[in-house]
Every structure is written in C-alpha cells, then in structure tokens.
Amino acid sequence: MSNFSSRKKSPTGNDLKSARGAELRQQGFQDVNKRRAFLQDNSWIKKPPEEEQDGNYGRVVLNRHNSHDALDRKLIERDEPKATISRYRSEDMLDRTLSSFRTPQSTKTPAVSSFNANTTATASTPATTPVKKKRQSWFPPPPPGHNASPSTAASRRDPALHPPLPPKPCSPIASPKPLGRTNRQIHAATAGACGETERHAERNIRTEDLDDIIRVAAALQKTDKGEELDNLIRMNKSLNRNQGLDGLFRANLKAQQLDKRAQSLESLIYMNTQTDRDGKGNQAFGSLKKINQRADPDRRSQDLRSVIRTHATAERIGRRKQDLDGLIKVNPDTNKNMKRGKSLDNLIKVTPEVNRSNKGGPSLDNFTKGVPARSRANQRDQDLDSLIKVTPSANRSSQHSLDELINTSPQTIKTTARHQDLDKFIKVNPDVLTNNQRNHDVDSTIRGNPTGTRCEQSEELDNLIKVKPSALRNTNGGQDLESLTEVNSHVAEKNGRIDGQANGLTNSLFKESTRASVYSYEARNSLSSNSGNKNGGPKDTVVYTRTYVENSKSPKDGYQENISGKYIQTVYSTSDRSVIERDMCTYCRKPLGVETKMILDELQICCHSTCFKCEICKRPLENLQAGDSIWIYRQTIHCEPCYSKVMAKWIQ
C-alpha cells in the first residue's frame, strides 16, 4: 500500500494529452516506415476482396466495434458509436496502407495499440482487477482528478515486479524493412493467442475503465524484463545470443512465391528455431519440409554394382568364354538419371552379330562398337564414335590385331574387297575412293603425286610426306623426288579445291605440282650444295623449302609467259644460318667483307659489285652508280642490250 500511496498523485489532463501526442507522432513514424516496408517486400499483393471476407469475417467484425475507443475519445464523443482499427487486423491495415493516407481517426488507433503493447510488457497478471467506484467516473461529468485512474492502476502492481519502461523512440530515418518484418512477425506469433482475451475485453468494454481495457495477452505476459514493443518476440533459450532477427523467422521463399495470393499477413510462418534446426516437428506448410538428398536411402545408396546388371541374353551369349566387360556398355548420362523402375535395357548395349561371329576367346577389342543403329544406316554425317565398327569377316580371321579392324567409313567396307588390310580400309575421302581405282592403298590416297603408287605398302607414312634433312644435304641428282619434297595444301586451294585435301586433285594438276616442286628443290639444293662445298657453312642446318604455286609452269617455257609465273620461296633456318646468308655473296657465295655491295631486297640479292652481272649475257654491271637504271624482266636482271632485244620481240 505504500507504493499505492506514493503514486496516488496523478498527472493532469494536459500532461496525459502531451504524452499521447508524443506517442501518436511516434506511431505516425512507424506507420510511414511500415508502409514503406510493405511496398518493398511485396506484402501488399493480396487476393481479391470478395474472397477474403469469409476467412476472417468474425474477427474483423469484433475488432471493428468498440475496440480501445475509451483511451483517446473526447468527453463530447463518449456516447457516439465509434469503430476503431486494431493494429492486429492485418487485412484492413493493408487496405488502408494502399490508400493515399490514413484519416486522422485511423492514425490514432495504432498509437493506442502501441501504448497497449508497451504497457503489456510491464504487466504480471492476466488482467488488472476492475475497481467499481472508479468505473462510475466515466459516465457522469468527471471531477478534475478523474484522470488518476491510469496511475492508480499502475500503483496497484506488486512492487517486486519490473518498473514500466518508456517506449522505444523510433526515428523516421530508421531502417524500414526490419520494422515491417518485425510488425508482421509479431502479429503472426501472437494473433492466435490474443484472440480469446481480446474478444472478452471487447464484450465488456462499455463497463470497464482504463485498467480493464489494457489487457495483457496470455502469450505475451511471460516476456523477460525490460522488453519493449520491438522486443516482444520470444526467443528460444537454446538460440545463440548473437543471432539476429533474421535467424528467428525463416520462411521458405519458394512457398511464399507460390502461395502469395492465398496468404494473408496472419499466415506468415512462425517457425521455432529448435524445430527448424532439427528438421522435424510441427512445421507449418508441407512445402517447408527439408529433404536431405544425400541421406535418401532409396536412390542415393545405389552403387555401380547395382546399376550394371547383366541382361539375360547377354548372360547366355557370355557363356562362350567371353569376358563380361566386352558385353556391357554403360551410358553415364543414363546412369545419372536412372530411376528404380526403369528397365536396364537402356543401360546395356550388346552387339549380337559381333558375338555370333566371334569364336574362341576374343579380347575386349573385338567387341567395341559405337552406335549400332547409325552403323547399320550408313549415314554420311556420322561422328567418330559411329565410324568404329568391327568387321565380321576380319574378326573370323583371328590373326589380325585391333588396328586392322578399325574402319573409317562404312561405305568403304562394302566397296572394298574383304581381304584388304588396314591400308585399304582407311580412306581419307570416300568420294575420291569411288572415282579412283579401288585397289589404291592409303599411300596413293594421301599423296599428291600419282607416282606414290609405286611405293610399297610397308613404307612408313612419314617417309612419304616429310622432308628429309639428310636428303637436302646430299647433292646426288638421282634421288627420288617423293622422299624429299612436300606439296603444300595451298596448291589445292589455288586450283579450286577448298577442302585442303590433296587426294582430290586431277592427274594434270599432279604433274604441274610435281614440276613446280622439282624446280624449287633443284634451285634450293644447288645453293645449299654450293654453300657447303665452297664456304664451309654449318653442316647441321636444315633448309625447308615451301613452294606456293601461283602459275605452275616448268622453267623451260622461257619468256612466253608473263611475270606471274615465278615462285616465292621461304627459307626456314637457324639464326646462325641467317646471319651467314646475309654476309655472303648471292652469286659467288663468298663473304662480303668490306667491299662494295649490291643489294636488291626485292630479288633477295646481296652480292659483290664485281659479281653483279646481267643474267642473260653475263655482262658485268659493277660500274653502276646511284641514279643509274637497271632492267629487271621476269625477276631477272638484264643489261640494256638484252632488254632491247626483249622489247623488240614484243614489237614484232
């Protein structure tokens, strides 16, 4: 009673109005932040209004009439019926949030709820005891001290309980999204628990004073000391202290997106953190159920042995001393997507014809087959996997190895004799094979020279195409041309064969390319031999000559053709060789030294002045000075008389 007597003095009406005005301003800031949060997280999307009346109709009606109206109504309005809005009615609050702005009447009532919830944190009993004599002071004109009832009600509390805390100030610049989420989650957690108590308070609202109006929800009376409106959410004791508000409320985003039109604000999921951590218990909605895919014992525990099973037909065929690995082909993509009830026929591919044709103890190599359907169809757009096929006739003769059984094209098997070996199976171009003789081997198909058919089949392919360094250093004129030169694939491009394969050339083009290669080789070989004999150049230097034929003609054609009939030679050599070539005379192959030089970069001529002569009559041109003229016809140096003769031929 000492506590009651010490707090008996009540504030005046103006003080209470100023306190309510501050709370109204604070609640206005919260409404602005709440509206901003609703617009940001798409919680304003609702189903049509004709469908949502039935779900919460009873509670909406109860909250609409005589709810907390005695707190802020004036004396002249006490007998007027007045419908106020509770902050726990999310449906109507969303409707008024989407409107332009709330009316002052609707703005006041959430402040009442804020004051109600703030007072809730300090209460210890389910409801304060009504006082009969104070209840009568609301109906007659009140005495000057009639506002003492809030302090009187507060003075009846047990002095051992917690003192009331002032409301938490909320600035308008606070983060809007956490506030919006907190308000929604508070309502989702406490709406069901507060329903019965609030209905009971609303039935007796006209006969109760301020002490009876401020009701404490049963679910919110057990909160810890010092909690405010933002801290009314109960935390699990097993939860860590440093876990924020986001850790308390974990909703499945996919479930919210799917059911957003059917959800109201009350249906947001409040999940216990211990239940969520265990993955069990009474979780709301079946869509939140977590399935541990790794722990699924039905599908994930299958190993490779349960997937690869021998088919019945494969087991009957495999009795002939055949290895099981040769019969089974597992598709990895099918293995990943396999279901338990799926037939294993899609996993195992057995070639019956290969198994029937195989006798004895064949190895795994004889059973290799790509796609059987494509191999029988003989399609032209087959990839490499569909081109590897086992030849049954070659398989019967068990003396051949695996290399003899690989065929590049299925058409080649049909058009080629059965007794041919690997050289007759591998054809670069099947179309060329039908045009040429069918007994051509691989050497005549790959080579650009028809003389390559004289080469034996046992000769290696590298000896036919690659330039031999030892052959370049040798100056014997009787060497075989085919073992020395390389016909570049650009020859085929210049003659209209864009595919770059030398086997598509005609016989006339083969002859012209051969003559061009001969001329290129002899010219280069003579230079190399001269340098080796006279100047003692490095013996280990290899000069590779690549000839680009622009107009393939032999040198004996003379001057009847135009200038485009010459050759462009590219010399690949070591750095030592290039330095020596620059310091040597082009004609005499001696070091240039400090003597007078004649350098013609276009003709790649760098020689002594005494060696610079007319290439027709061998007349020396060493007396030329700067500004004098020389005549070059078909990249050949002419003196003035020789050039005059050429001009006379043109006039005639």
From Swiss-Prot:
GO biological process terms, semicolon-separated: embryo development ending in birth or egg hatching; epidermis development; keratinocyte differentiation; positive regulation of canonical Wnt signaling pathway; response to mechanical stimulus
Subcellular location: Cytoplasm; Membrane
Domain of life: Eukaryota
Biased composition (Polar residues): 97-110, 446-455
Compositionally biased residues, Pro residues: 161-170
Mapped Sequence repeat ranges: 207-226, 227-241, 242-261, 262-281, 282-301, 302-320, 321-340, 341-360, 361-380, 381-398, 399-418, 419-438, 439-458, 459-477, 478-496
Keyword Aminoacyl-tRNA synthetase: no
GO molecular function: metal ion binding
Major localisation: cytoplasm
Region Disordered: start-end pairs: 1-29, 43-180, 353-385, 436-455
Modified residues (Phosphoserine): 264, 343
Gene3D superfamilies (UniProt xref): Cysteine Rich Protein
KW Cytoplasm (keyword) present: yes
Modified residues (N6-acetyllysine): 82
GO cellular component, one term: membrane
Annotated stretches, region: 15 X approximate tandem repeats: 207-496
Comp. bias intervals (Basic residues): 1-10
Tissue-wise expression: Expressed in the upper layers of stratified epithelia, including, ependyma and choroid plexus of the brain ventricles.
PANTHER family: SCIELLIN, ZNF185
Biological function: May function in the assembly or regulation of proteins in the cornified envelope. The LIM domain may be involved in homotypic or heterotypic associations and may function to localize sciellin to the cornified envelope.
Protein name, UniProt field: Sciellin
